[in-house]
Amino acid sequence: ERIKELRDLMSQSRTREILTKTTVDHMAIIKKYTSGRQEKNPALRMKWMMAMKYPITADKRIIEMIPERNEQGQTLWSKTNDAGSDRVMVSPLAVTWWNRNGPTTSAVHYPKVYKTYFEKVERLKHGTFGPVHFRNQVKIRRRVDINPGHADLSAKEAQDVIMEVVFPNEVGARILTSESQLTITKEKKEELQDCKIAPLMVAYMLERELVRKTRFLPVAGGTSSVYIEVLHLTQGTCWEQMYTPGGEVRNDDVDQSLIIAARNIVRRATVSADPLASLLEMCHSTQIGGIRMVDILRQNPTEEQAVDICKAAMGLRISSSFSFGGFTFKRTSGSSVKKEEEVLTGNLQTLKIRVHEGYEEFTMVGRRATAILRKATRRLIQLIVSGRDEQSIAEAIIVAMVFSQEDCMIKAVRGDLNFVNRANQRLNPMHQLLRHFQKDAKVLFQNWGIEPIDNVMGMIGILPDMTPSTEMSLRGVRVSKMGVDEYSSTERVVVSIDRFLRVRDQRGNVLLSPEEVSETQGTEKLTITYSSSMMWEINGPESVLVNTYQWIIRNWETVKIQWSQDPTMLYNKMEFEPFQSLVPKAARGQYSGFVRTLFQQMRDVLGTFDTVQIIKLLPFAAAPPEQSRMQFSSLTVNVRGSGMRILVRGNSPVFNYNKATKRLTVLGKDAGALTEDPDEGTAGVESAVLRGFLILGKEDKRYGPALSINELSNLAKGEKANVLIGQGDVVLVMKRKRDSSILTDSQTATKRIRMAI
């Protein structure tokens, strides 16, 4: 009916005229297409704009810069003004003319501003694409870095840098505090001097360079940013293409080196007397690629067990998921309460375990396998695993079985559980069980039990010998083709850490502990500089030897004064700790007693002070001394797989002082130069500062002109004077109020040592 009516209307010429000639004036339609700045039909708009003769508007100045007609005689701009603005209407041909004949600007800033793009092109040019393989891709969503070549500034820090570089004259408080902010700002201001590129563009590009951008993407394979930038080229739903990046980027190197540094530091801290204090000391004194590790930790979102322990120690928030057996567990539903329970192993050993009572579901994500676990109190209900290979799947199954705390798992233990950590402390029961079955899980799998399975799409069974099956499977366990996504949330929670580096959330659940730190060794991409003496041994005995002597030489001025006035404090310095492991156990105490007696004689008899000898023997005096009459002409240190000798008097391959160059070499490596001349006879005595006198500080004119060493003997006890010592330095000294004999001094030293130990 309606269509017929419409046809009738259309047959009248007036209707046709109204529809084609008159303007549309229905308010609703006008509103729809004109409200807001957003173009409602961009494709149509583009089409009809380009059909016009002058679709572009330009600044008035363009008339002076462009001819009215081009070489072909086509008009480039119209004399009529743009309605509603004072701009002129221009033809698309004007753009062509401008591109061919317009003024050129310097191209020098382009590679600097578009640095990330230029670098990407280079990486792709030098990258190698291998063959395409067709196979099922187990992809799991992980949070990945999608922006290679960035610094690690927070959004706020980057904003301040960008404002300072691009809009330096804009009003607004900008606080550039961190070292990286200041360095980047200075560098960019220099690079972008006289830059003609639109400031907004520069700002966008700077943001790409300064801020880490992450996305939650399905990935099978490499997760570093140089792989993610070619994700669309390297993996599809059923295919993958091999690819080797044509270059590395600093942000990936920082992530990789940070993990290695954190692992080394946590491992080292675990074996020291106060793990937490040691860990903090090492984090604060370590640099990675020339940047302080603590600064990197504050900015870098990498989640790895050791890195998170370091962050927790610094009071930073970390992810609320917890780690067990190298898998990251995230509870997705359910809840539990913890109760201590005693259980008996198959070997009738009693274990005290904290049992989780209640139904819970977890996702487990590891490097090479992922799983979904549903469990009740001491019972595994269901485990769905997926992984790269049989080995990886087995690892995940073992961890889940141990985590389930099932009785048949505990009964599968054969032999005693006595695993210890690096500090020789027994591991907690859950980690005891884990280590036991990681070594050999045969009995565990045999005793677990098997069940017939239903045919479910995408799932198959797995037998106790880890072979796949469509008929039977380990009780509750299935293998899936699909991976389990990593936990996507980036929420961070406040945690606490105890002195043994166990990290807990606010409910007291343990999220991390040193047992969870991987033992994998890698080679860092960026130089890691550990200034802490605790890390000297990381490169072996030789490095300990060289570092110890370098430390003494670097700090000789203060060491020298302590040597003469408060030797006990000097001997207790932690810098001498690593050295003790090089001295044969049986000889440590004897060497120490011998060297301390020798030093005491040097302090007592003027003129026998010998800088080189003190430096050489000092590390040996740090061990608790044994009082014996033993004399030694050489002391043994264990390096290069055997005992090497340090001569008490004279040079040796281990310790060689060159008088001519005043340089010390240890095992052929340069250990530094001695600033003072050790052979000036009494000058040496002066610089050791005489026994019976206390150095009070710098010269004080109130106490008259500087005396020579010989004039000192006239001072009364408690009297102060300025003295001229070795290098023409003048210091203020005071004669001690009581004469301390050798005997009392050595006795108090020994007593103090005993107390300190």
Swiss-Prot record:
Q: Which SUPFAM superfamilies match?
A: PB2 C-terminal domain-like
Which Pfam families does the protein's record reference? Flu_PB2_1st (PF20947), Flu_PB2_2nd (PF20948), Flu_PB2_3rd (PF20949), Flu_PB2_4th (PF20950), Flu_PB2_5th (PF00604), Flu_PB2_6th (PF20951), Flu_PB2_7th (PF20952)
| Residues flagged as site, Avian adaptation | E626
Gene Ontology CC entries for this record: host cell nucleus; virion component
Instruction: Give the GO biological process terms.
Output: 7-methylguanosine mRNA capping; cap snatching; DNA-templated transcription; symbiont-mediated suppression of host gene expression; symbiont-mediated suppression of host mRNA transcription via inhibition of RNA polymerase II activity; viral RNA genome replication
* GO MF: RNA binding
Q: Motif Nuclear localization signal, which positions?
A: 735-738
Keywords (A to Z) from UniProt: Cap snatching, Eukaryotic host gene expression shutoff by virus, Eukaryotic host transcription shutoff by virus, Host gene expression shutoff by virus, Host nucleus, Host-virus interaction, Inhibition of host RNA polymerase II by virus, mRNA capping, mRNA processing, Viral transcription, Virion
Q: Which InterPro entries match?
A: Flu_PB2_2nd (IPR049110), Flu_PB2_6th (IPR049114), Flu_PB2_C (IPR049115), Flu_PB2_CAP-bd (IPR048298), Flu_PB2_middle (IPR049111), Flu_PB2_N (IPR049106), INV_PB2 (IPR001591), PB2_helical (IPR049113)
Q: Where in the cell is it found?
A: Virion; Host nucleus
Tell me which family the UniProt entry assigns to this protein. Answer: Belongs to the influenza viruses PB2 family.
Task performed by this protein = Plays an essential role in transcription initiation and cap-stealing mechanism, in which cellular capped pre-mRNAs are used to generate primers for viral transcription. Recognizes and binds the 7-methylguanosine-containing cap of the target pre-RNA which is subsequently cleaved after 10-13 nucleotides by the viral protein PA. Plays a role in the initiation of the viral genome replication and modulates the activity of the ribonucleoprotein (RNP) complex.
Q: How does it assemble?
A: Influenza RNA polymerase is composed of three subunits: PB1, PB2 and PA. Interacts (via N-terminus) with PB1 (via C-terminus). Interacts with nucleoprotein NP (via N-terminus).
- Protein name according to UniProt: Polymerase basic protein 2
Name the source organism.
Influenza A virus (strain A/Silky Chicken/Hong Kong/YU100/2002 H5N1 genotype X3)
Gene this chain is encoded by: PB2
